[in-house]
Amino acid sequence: MEDKEQQDNAKLENNESLKDLGVNVLSQSSLEEKIANDVTNFSNLQSLQQEETRLERSKTALQRYVNKKNHLTRKLNNTTRISVKQNLRDQIKNLQSDDIERVLKDIDDIQSRIKELKEQVDQGAENKGSKEGLQRPGETEKEFLIRTGKITAFGHKAGFSLDTANREYAKNDEQKDEDFEMATEQMVENLTDEDDNLSDQDYQMSGKESEDDEEEENDDKILKELEDLRFRGQPGEAKDDGDELYYQERLKKWVKQRSCGSQRSSDLPEWRRPHPNIPDAKLNSQFKIPGEIYSLLFNYQKTCVQWLYELYQQNCGGIIGDEMGLGKTIQVIAFIAALHHSGLLTGPVLIVCPATVMKQWCNEFQHWWPPLRTVILHSMGSGMASDQKFKMDENDLENLIMNSKPSDFSYEDWKNSTRTKKALESSYHLDKLIDKVVTDGHILITTYVGLRIHSDKLLKVKWQYAVLDEGHKIRNPDSEISLTCKKLKTHNRIILSGTPIQNNLTELWSLFDFIFPGKLGTLPVFQQQFVIPINIGGYANATNIQVQTGYKCAVALRDLISPYLLRRVKADVAKDLPQKKEMVLFCKLTKYQRSKYLEFLHSSDLNQIQNGKRNVLFGIDILRKICNHPDLLDRDTKRHNPDYGDPKRSGKMQVVKQLLLLWHKQGYKALLFTQSRQMLDILEEFISTKDPDLSHLNYLRMDGTTNIKGRQSLVDRFNNESFDVFLLTTRVGGLGVNLTGANRIIIFDPDWNPSTDMQARERAWRIGQKREVSIYRLMVGGSIEEKIYHRQIFKQFLTNRILTDPKQKRFFKIHELHDLFSLGGENGYSTEELNEEVQKHTENLKNSKSEESDDFEQLVNLSGVSKLESFYNGKEKKENSKTEDDRLIEGLLGGESNLETVMSHDSVVNSHAGSSSSNIITKEASRVAIEAVNALRKSRKKITKQYEIGTPTWTGRFGKAGKIRKRDPLKNKLTGSAAILGNITKSQKEASKEARQENYDDGITFARSKEINSNTKTLENIRAYLQKQNNFFSSSVSILNSIGVSLSDKEDVIKVRALLKTIAQFDKERKGWVLDEEFRNNNAS
């Protein structure tokens, strides 16, 4: 009672001291539910409209057939000749069996889908049965168990059992808790004390200032760093095992601690023995996980380890596509440690990852399984300085140059002898590091650029495992890094990626071709057999048979890849994660900010924007800077003034101050994210010197200028020491950074694409977090920030491409500019109905308070706060309600809208229930899918039988495996997709048992022989024209004029472009087409 009274008194005191304004508190749950229902209804209505249009076309076609039948019937009744009567009867019979029955079946299928869509609209498109932990509608038991981490992607149940041979062991909850505590103690003992040896200088940020907003570290920057390394040979500071003495000391310490001084009768080394107090978990007689690791894994992580072993047994790889924060790194390390513990790790392991997480990989290996030798192949690695005995003098260099081949060294090499000597010394260190790992084991860590630079050395090695972290970097099948990765000599390949399927089948092919070369055939075969039917089935004007064929091909493709892709999300498996609350805190403008804002709204610059004479983004950027801090506008002239960045001129900074002081009293740690270093500079001065009230707060800072070598140390300090706030840029918070020491997050200037901010959120709300996490996005009420944010809420459900596709120029329309470039209208909602709905549920958020929640009444009364609104991420909410089947099919079909256009799985099944064997459409859709799979199998056999591992698969431009030398390349290119569609036509003719010469009357049908011949002739004309041009180049207009093709609609443009792409490449710089080399021969046709 006394504690409760003290808490209440503290709340009253805070309210009295902070209370300025009363504001609206808006419920996140009601806002999400209302908008989600609105947009789902909108999407269903759009799908319903497409289906009704398709139904109308089918009814029109039916009426034509009926009229024709009636006409033939009248002629039959009026004629007297027996031969004519028989001919008319045959025509009527064929018309009824081939055309009328087919259209009637189309109408029946379409009406079934329309009925389902209308039911969803009538019910408000409520997602029933999508509660966490429950099986969802349309989901099989196997899909449910895979999604929740109960079974592997191959359908096998968790098969680990505790190895209790020769010991008494009770498998109960109490014993499990003891195992967990002992394993945790073992992990603590495994930690190194390297951070204690770092000086304060390691944590000082660079004083260099940049004119540009922070940009994500790219490959070119890392490439320059590694190229410099080859000549400078700067010693690294990371405590990896490139220093053999360090590894031996660490190994000796671990052996001593783990054995606990007990007598061991076995002759096996310590890493092969079970823990003296924690039993191993064995899957079979060969594969065991060390007890101290197994005890710390979540159930779904144990399932992943078993799945990786199943892949190992099949001599192939897989993709771990778990959502960010579920411990993909730990699952891989646990598996490799189990291989080592079981005596199955007989070769080296290569880890390829972004430079920012190399040290984290090293730390995690040393933490979870210390006996593994882990070496970083980078300037930060200690191996670059571990052997200074090798020094080349001038005489050695001169002898080497004189005795070498002329092509080995140039005159410049001899002239710049110092640089050449350092390069050779550095190369010696690299060779020695690689040889050490290959000879003695175990782990070599490098970057994607490092793999490319040192490919001459790394591609020669026979690796037991190759792991690509952030493996979607190889999604472009023709990029140099993709081809390099696919040359690695190992069958055991693992990709880690939180976004393995991103609505692009070609990218999906590239990833799978790495983990299982040839599984999906060559890229041209894959595109012909799957991409074309799936894409055609997604068109709004697709016929019923095209819709079903596309869906069945997607299902067939899903069945091919699903065993090798493991994808789980937090909502399904991480039941023990604490609650997360996301809110938008709307701040007020200061008087100075308001005057600056209005000044721009009345400026000539805005007039130019509204008249289309200036880029819209120019004005938006100015207003966003004003919302953050108006001094950013005149940074070049004011940054040296003492009052630059004055916190009193920023409403957001005043809110930040009160939040940090409030959380400091409560003992909470906070992460403060902003998008640019300029704003981060202002915030750092604000906390360190500009405001005396904040001077007692301890903080750290990390941005793009922070040396990669020191980033992990900063993270460890923040998690383990008494810091109040960590200042970070949104991007550098980055991949794999674990900041679970914080349970409060402020995103100072949210990105317009909310998914970008998810990286920042996941730093704290992830496995290992024990407390409730609150995330606050700061926006200025009534400003351009709020206006765009509320537009996003609705548009987010319609399509994700608006924000991610640079070709979408229509996001900002001219007629919207007046509303965007205004101040006020703080409601921000698109409809009054939505506003009333939110107001009605205002109290919901207040009632959701827990012991670790912030007092929302207190927050909205902070000085400078206009209102509090729960953050809405509709995409994430809807994603959590999907089955794994939905996610995979959606990715294959190219997005959610296409999935809804095609139909749900239930709709396909139900619409064909009870249909007879004469259902031509269903049979042909299935046949196309089966033939597509068979084509892949045939292509795969050619790849796997004829080529060794490490031979890149033919992509149509690069690669060797599976490439077919064509005698008639033009002809073969033509028959690819046409063959698929032609088979359906052929089967329809067989089903009617009589050949028919009549085309399908609705004009949207599959390829006929006439169309194929027309396309062949067009292609030959295009090739002949380009053959005569200079450099085989011509513009699109010239090509069309020369061959006399008329384009009547968009479909004609798509067809001609598709034909052009088969024999020519588009040159973006010259804006025209260049004929492929294989068609430049006069005999190519």
Swiss-Prot record:
CDD domains: DEXHc_ERCC6, SF2_C_SNF. PROSITE patterns: HELICASE_ATP_BIND_1, HELICASE_CTER. GO terms for molecular function: ATP binding; ATP hydrolysis activity; ATP-dependent activity, acting on DNA; ATP-dependent chromatin remodeler activity; DNA binding; helicase activity. ATP binds at residues 322-329. Residues 118-141, 190-219 are annotated as: Disordered. Residues 309-518 form the Helicase ATP-binding domain. The modification Phosphoserine is found at residue 30. Its main location: nucleus. Residues 655-818 form the Helicase C-terminal domain. A motif (DEGH box) lies at residues 469-472. Keywords: ATP-binding, DNA damage, DNA repair, DNA-binding, Helicase, Hydrolase, Nucleotide-binding, Nucleus, Phosphoprotein. One of its GO terms (biological process) is nucleotide-excision repair. One of its GO terms (cellular component) is chromatin. It catalyses: ATP + H2O = ADP + phosphate + H(+). Its EC number is 3.6.4.12. It comes from the Eukaryota. Residues 210-219 have a biased composition (Acidic residues). It is found in: Nucleus. The keyword Nucleus applies. InterPro entries: Helicase_ATP-bd, Helicase_C-like, P-loop_NTPase, SNF2-like_sf, SNF2/RAD54-like_C, SNF2_N, SNF2_RAD54_helicase_repair. May be involved in the preferential repair of active genes. PANTHER family: DNA EXCISION REPAIR PROTEIN ERCC-6-RELATED, SNF2/RAD54 FAMILY MEMBER. Belongs to the SNF2/RAD54 helicase family. This is DNA repair and recombination protein RAD26. It comes from Saccharomyces cerevisiae (strain ATCC 204508 / S288c) (Baker's yeast). The lineage of its organism: Eukaryota, Fungi, Dikarya, Ascomycota, Saccharomycotina.
